[in-house]
Amino acid sequence: MRINPTTSSPVVSTLEEKNLGRIAQIIGPVLDVVFPPGKMPNIYNALVVKGRDTVGQQINVTCEVQQLLGNNRVRAVAMSATDGLMRGMEVIDTGAPLSVPVGGATLGRIFNVLGEPVDNLGPVDTRTTSPIHRSAPAFIQLDTKLSIFETGIKVVDLLAPYRRGGKIGLFGGAGVGKTVLIMELINNIAKAHGGVSVFGGVGERTREGNDLYMEMKESGVINEKNIAESKVALVYGQMNEPPGARMRVGLTALTMAEYFRDVNEQDVLLFIDNIFRFVQAGSEVSALLGRMPSAVGYQPTLSTEMGSLQERITSTKEGSITSIQAVYVPADDLTDPAPATTFAHLDATTVLSRVLAAKGIYPAVDPLDSTSTMLQPRIVGEEHYETAQRVKQTSQRYKELQDIIAILGLDELSEEDRLTVARARKIERFLSQPFFVAEVFTGSPGKYVGLAETIRGFQLILSGELDGLPEQAFYLVGNIDEATAKAMNLEVESKLNK
């Protein structure tokens, strides 16, 4: 791993200081810069524009070289607003790509695309930095073993297990619990795997970024009293930022995650919210650079850009980066080039259902819509596979019977179907689980359920051994022993009430 001992905003050596250019043209966030003959910067080099605008305000804009136009001109995309820039202003070639701080100093802090802290908590230790443009790990470095990434969340581990070093798509509308699920995963990886997380907010609402930060502080994922004990680093490039920043903020977050994997040899969770905005920003930049648009107006380099990000997210022999990416589907059209290109890279999908959230079943993961390439007998074992398939079959049969129940009632069903419905309702409730990060809101302690316990619990429900227990005993409990204990308590309470 290459580590450049530079600071977060590119520092210029005296030798490179002579490599100065001048702004020739400004088109919104795109700058054309003229350099002396033979002094052309490389593609992806960071350029810095420093000076004062017409009212004397200090300007410090970092850009990234995207095209070499000929005639000693380069075209660069700005990473921040270009307000106040003028033709003829001096531009410094830093001689290297953007570099951002990496390592333990990033935990508990919020950064922008340039790796500058934006949380007003003072400077960050920038002795260890890394360039945001790196090649994906070589084939020989990859860890090709297929292994399950245990999350401690029953519905995920049983029905749509995550792959260590894999990529998971998180689908769900507003208010169905995406943020809480993300925070629980951050908490569980820190406790069970001793790992850390990096959250990349790509082109989403600033309010949502602020809410997430506040909720993380409240739930202890970010430790305010001792920042070093925090479990997550946050990198934001929100909706109000120029397209250059939104296009590169995912790479900044990924670079921080790669350091934890390659140098600290840890398991890392990388969250990207939202991967669609990364594509959208790339589309804007592509149009600004004058490229001919491709299908549905997207950039012609769509799959290349997506591949260069996704291929760096993988397991190596040192550690793993497991990525969970929120996917916005424009107009609910899964054939749109942006989500369609994303699907090609995903190992699992976790679909959150508004119907389940309305019933109060959290996490509101849809057991029938969520999928995983890992759910195969040769990977998870026959016992796990059989249990998962039977849970899905029972849930599917209940779904088919719901219309009949709504019209005719339960009494009109056959004995076998009534038994199926009773078990399916127990399964539905047993798929709910109290979260550690929700303790502050619910008052009930969180539960981490191991995979073996999860399988045992569902086998007992499917076998009919627990048919005599009331279904409310299975709601918001950890393992199956807690459900039987809760059933006994309910029985005692009902006797006392009589």
From Swiss-Prot:
S-S bridge residues: none
Keyword Thylakoid: yes
GO function terms (MF aspect): ATP binding; ATP hydrolysis activity; proton-transporting ATP synthase activity, rotational mechanism
Residues that coordinate or bind ATP: 172-179
Keyword tags: ATP synthesis, ATP-binding, CF(1), Chloroplast, Hydrogen ion transport, Ion transport, Membrane, Nucleotide-binding, Plastid, Thylakoid, Translocase, Transport
Pfam family, one: ATP-synt_VA_C
CDD domains in the record: ATP-synt_F1_beta_C, ATP-synt_F1_beta_N, F1-ATPase_beta_CD
A Gene Ontology BP annotation from the UniProt entry: proton motive force-driven mitochondrial ATP synthesis
Reaction equation(s) it catalyzes: ATP + H2O + 4 H(+)(in) = ADP + phosphate + 5 H(+)(out)
Record's GO cellular component terms: chloroplast thylakoid membrane; mitochondrion; proton-transporting ATP synthase complex
The EC number(s) this enzyme carries: 7.1.2.2
Topology in the lipid bilayer: Peripheral membrane protein
SMART domains assigned to the protein according to its UniProt record, in alphabetical order: AAA (SM00382)
Compartments reported by the entry: Plastid, Chloroplast thylakoid membrane
Function: Produces ATP from ADP in the presence of a proton gradient across the membrane. The catalytic sites are hosted primarily by the beta subunits.
Family: Belongs to the ATPase alpha/beta chains family.
Complexes and interactors: F-type ATPases have 2 components, CF(1) - the catalytic core - and CF(0) - the membrane proton channel. CF(1) has five subunits: alpha(3), beta(3), gamma(1), delta(1), epsilon(1). CF(0) has four main subunits: a(1), b(1), b'(1) and c(9-12).
PANTHER family from the UniProt entry: ATP SYNTHASE, ATP SYNTHASE SUBUNIT BETA, MITOCHONDRIAL
Name of the protein this chain belongs to: ATP synthase subunit beta, chloroplastic
Organism the protein comes from: Hyophorbe lagenicaulis
Annotated gene: atpB
